[in-house]
Amino acid sequence: MKRSMYAGRVREEHIGTTITLKGWVSRRRDLGGLIFIDLRDREGVMQLVINPEEVSSDVMATAERLRSEYVIEVEGFVEARQQANDKLATGMVELKVSALTILNTAKTTPFEIKDDAEVSDDTRLRYRYLDLRRPEMLENFKLRAKVTHSIRNYLDDLEFIDVETPMLTKSTPEGARDYLVPSRVSQGHFYALPQSPQITKQLLMNAGFDRYYQIVKCFRDEDLRGDRQPEFTQVDLETSFLSEQEIQDIVEGMIAKVMKETKEIDVTLPFPRMSYDVAMNSYGSDKPDTRFEMLLQDLTVTVKGIDFKVFSEAPAVKAIVVKGNADRYSRKDIDKLTEFAKQFGAKGLAWVKVTDGQFSGPVAKFLTAIETELSSQLKLAENDLVLFVADTLEVANNTLGALRNRIAKDLDMIDQSQFNFLWVVDWPMFEWSEEEGRYMSAHHPFTLPTPESAHELEGDLAKVRAIAYDIVLNGYELGGGSLRINQKEMQERMFKALGFTADEANDQFGFLLEAMDYGFPPHGGLAIGLDRFVMLLAEKDNIREVIAFPKNNKASDPMTQAPSLVSENQLEELSLQIESHD
């Protein structure tokens, strides 16, 4: 029989009609001779009633066989429920069953198919097809579909062209580790799965496409955390002849449309703009969460002359003030914060509390001479807790930025209903890598430097600034973009600044440099992490909740057991040998 509608969409207007429904048995109950079935499909749950006095013995026998997650087809008459269930969208009606067919049986599931089931992450991933039956998960993917639909409509209306770029591409340096794919035809050679379509989308601008977009899968072999996966999806844009501001206007319009259509939220445009330096110095992060205060305070000058060398001789001394919550933190609690601070390079964490109008704590005695000045500068009040870090500016910022976020969560200081977007601009072009012992691109080596700082490509690389912009939402980097280099001479200077010889640059990027000989237009763009965006809209804390078949924190799939061993024949065909490092 043809299904009449989704079970979760039956309403009062259907009372008095005969319909056919198909779905899964969510629950079966026997009460006073009647059998009640909760039938679940992707749109919700509908109550079925099977009365032995009104159905055949065959139907009754079939009903008695039903167990959770059996797949069934039913026909029946829609009636008003005697006792409405306000918790269900279908709670005003029920289906009086006249015909019942079992379409498939099911084993007992390893966990209950309900939103509040307590189950480990790996078990959820091992039985992902069951996990995805939970209503909450279905809603996540409906939301994701709405987001992508909204984005496509918006960009189509602006005459962006949707173009697919290659999945098998060339491995290039200056990024995370590539996933490599050996070539059977060209033995000893490898493709790389793209970390982004960066170069190919730039080449599309050279081809005259003018406006490109793609919702594209990307791959990075990097350590995982809650907002990262080895394969992820991004909304990728590139435009020709537009300024930084024009590109940002397009992106803001796209996000405003998504927010309105998926969350019914009117966001204020334009988004605030914050320089990279302000973000780091005031928030201790290049992706600041602006839903709460507790800004970093620079005390380096204030403490310079005191008789406490830890402070007076430190390159930088900075602090955050936990307002009105000193009594929430015992010595043991602060010790935990100290251990947390050490993860970010700090040697320790100094602190004082304001108790009965005076400083108390291990370093209070060293601050007596400047207590009044500090109190004024930090605007201290009774029961405030001050946390200090004395170290390099970078360590002080990073440590206090991380503490700021942790404490805000611990004290429930964040308004979870807010969606605070902002642009972080005026980025440094390079960042120093202790591991590599050299400067590396803060974004990528195709970013255009500012005209005022480009001369430092042959001088002090720390002074080179980029025409780059990151879009931040609630403390997460949502995406990043820049204007790109379109002049060959500038691109060669950039490669040289990064330590490439001319031969190395030509070997890795010769095709791009050659393309710059053929009228490459000014261009720029941006990419937004779709998984992360949907995660935040769904108010989840892990992107696994919005990816259908994600990997775990070991980059493996407990369901398919990927990655897996392959046969010797397959390795031989690729001229590969596996060496053990045990």
From Swiss-Prot:
What role does this protein play?
Catalyzes the attachment of L-aspartate to tRNA(Asp) in a two-step reaction: L-aspartate is first activated by ATP to form Asp-AMP and then transferred to the acceptor end of tRNA(Asp).
Question: Cross-referenced InterPro entries, in alphabetical order?
Answer: Aa-tRNA-synt_II (IPR004364), aa-tRNA-synth_II (IPR006195), aa-tRNA-synth_II/BPL/LPL (IPR045864), Asp-tRNA-ligase_1 (IPR004524), Asp-tRNA-ligase_1_N (IPR047089), Asp/Asn-tRNA-synth_IIb (IPR002312), AspRS_core (IPR047090), GAD-like_sf (IPR004115)
* Subcellular compartments: Cytoplasm
Molecular function terms, GO-annotated: aspartate-tRNA ligase activity; ATP binding; catalytic activity, acting on a protein; nucleic acid binding; transferase activity
Gene3D superfamilies per record: Bira Bifunctional Protein, Domain 2, GAD-like domain, Nucleic acid-binding proteins
The family classification in the record reads: Belongs to the class-II aminoacyl-tRNA synthetase family. Type 1 subfamily.
Q: Which GO terms describe its cellular component?
A: cytoplasm
Region Aspartate: which residues? 198-201
Protein name as it appears in the record: Aspartate--tRNA ligase
Name the domain of life this protein comes from: Bacteria
Q: Which UniProt keywords apply?
A: Aminoacyl-tRNA synthetase, ATP-binding, Cytoplasm, Ligase, Nucleotide-binding, Protein biosynthesis
* Record-linked Pfam families: GAD (PF02938), tRNA-synt_2 (PF00152), tRNA_anti-codon (PF01336)
- Give the residues the record marks as binding L-aspartate: 174, 220, 443, 484
Gene Ontology biological process terms from the UniProt entry: aspartyl-tRNA aminoacylation
Reactions catalysed? tRNA(Asp) + L-aspartate + ATP = L-aspartyl-tRNA(Asp) + AMP + diphosphate
Question: Tell me, how does this one assemble?
Answer: Homodimer.
For ATP, which residues are the binding ones?
Answer: 220-222, 229, 477, 529-532
PROSITE patterns (UniProt xref): AA_TRNA_LIGASE_II
EC category name: ligase
Enzyme Commission number(s) from the entry? 6.1.1.12
